[in-house]
């Protein structure tokens, strides 16, 4: 089973790392939106667990891991406390938000793809759920914060594409029986680096043909 590429301890640690980094990005956005402490916690939890909850419900992994492992619930609360007390320092580090988000994107797209395949889905469906695992929490985060989700906006740097690449790499490795801890890590790093490069060089997906690039919808 591909979900057992790593020892249970390593796999659980990677899951918590992904949850933590996504929760940080959600909590930081909540602070920028002037949410109270409860709102910060809610946005952190939703960002960290939303994509995984959707994946588990689709593949029939019920109850979802977020409801059976207390660590999955407590980790976003730890991120909430960290941001709540240290946000004046963290908020000045915009690159930190981007790095946290990119790291979570890479970790979740790989974990989501392998888990979906282990539950009997085909490679294409598994890759799609890997993408959903990676971006689902971010979409919910943006919606709750009253923002158009980043992956839907032309005037935002590539967000879904790096996750698509990472998920596709995992699916191809499974297809050719080449999925190992090394290739899984390579997929994580690829998605992570692509997201950071997109932020650095402002890579964006094309809009409808003949749509004037100078026209940007209101924020």
UniProtKB/Swiss-Prot annotation:
Keyword Cell membrane: yes
InterPro entries with a match to the protein in the record: Gly_transporter
Transmembrane portions of the chain: 10-30, 34-54, 66-86, 93-113, 120-140, 158-178
Membrane topology: Multi-pass membrane protein
Cellular component aspect of the GO annotation: plasma membrane
Chief location category: membrane
Compartment annotation: Cell membrane
Keywords per UniProt: Cell membrane, Membrane, Transmembrane, Transmembrane helix
Source organism superkingdom: Bacteria
Family in the record: Belongs to the UPF0126 family.
PANTHER family reported in the protein's UniProt record: INNER MEMBRANE PROTEIN, UPF0126 INNER MEMBRANE PROTEIN YADS-RELATED
Protein name listed in UniProt: UPF0126 membrane protein SCO5481
Species of origin: Streptomyces coelicolor (strain ATCC BAA-471 / A3(2) / M145)
